[in-house]
């Protein structure tokens, strides 16, 4: 997380076929919706600019988390109240922590506005 925002996010997956549980907390977000995505690279040397595009190994279109046709990195939005920590609680069946399409080592980006 770049800028004034900071936080911790955990990714848990029991088996390669199980959904991934994403939990955590982000501080310092302005009130409203913020895009929550996994980007292609784990490089943060130039902030979010060096993280590349959304993780999309299957060349799909941008979409909502429930869409069949979506980037693997499209995890939807998180809702910030603006005056308290923003909870992250997502269960996703498309991302994985196993194999060639694993999100391990990639960058999570919280976008300023959804």
Swiss-Prot record:
> Where, by residue number, does Zn(2+) bind?
54, 62, 71, 74
Keyword vocabulary terms for this entry: Antioxidant, Copper, Cytoplasm, Metal-binding, Oxidoreductase, Zinc
Cofactor dependency: Cu cation; Zn(2+)
- What are the coiled-coil residue ranges? none
SUPFAM superfamilies cross-referenced by the UniProt entry: Cu,Zn superoxide dismutase-like (SSF49329)
One GO MF term attached to the UniProt entry: copper ion binding
Q: Where is this region: Disordered?
A: 48-76
* Entry binding sites for Cu cation: 37, 39, 54, 111
Keyword Chaperone attached: no
Q: Identify the EC number(s).
A: 1.15.1.1
Query: Pfam families of this UniProt entry?
Result: Sod_Cu
Query: Where, subcellularly, is it found?
Result: Cytoplasm
Where mainly located?
cytoplasm
State the Gene3D superfamilies in the record.
Answer: Superoxide dismutase, copper/zinc binding domain (2.60.40.200)
Q: How is the cofactor bound?
A: Binds 1 copper ion per subunit. Binds 1 zinc ion per subunit.
GO CC, alphabetical: cytoplasm
Biased composition of type Basic and acidic residues is found at: 58-73
Q: Which reaction does it catalyse?
A: 2 superoxide + 2 H(+) = H2O2 + O2
Could you give the subunit structure recorded for this chain?
Homodimer.
Q: What does this protein do?
A: Destroys radicals which are normally produced within the cells and which are toxic to biological systems.
The Swiss-Prot or TrEMBL record describes its family as follows: Belongs to the Cu-Zn superoxide dismutase family.
Q: What is this protein called?
A: Superoxide dismutase [Cu-Zn]
- Taxonomic source organism: Drosophila obscura (Fruit fly)
């Amino acid at each position: 997380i770049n800028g004034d925002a900071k936080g911790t996010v955990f990714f848990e997956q029991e088996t390669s076929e199980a959904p991934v549980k994403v939990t955590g907390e982000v501080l310092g977000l302005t009130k409203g919706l913020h895009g929550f995505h996994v980007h292609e690279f784990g490089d943060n040397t130039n902030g979010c600019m060096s993280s590349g595009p959304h993780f999309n190994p299957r060349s799909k279109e941008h979409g909502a988390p429930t869409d069949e046709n979506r980037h693997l990195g499209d995890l939807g939005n998180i809702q910030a109240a603006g005056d308290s920590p923003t909870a992250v609680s997502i269960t996703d069946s498309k991302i994985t922590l196993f194999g060639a399409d694993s999100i391990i080592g990639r960058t999570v980006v919280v976008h300023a506005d959804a």
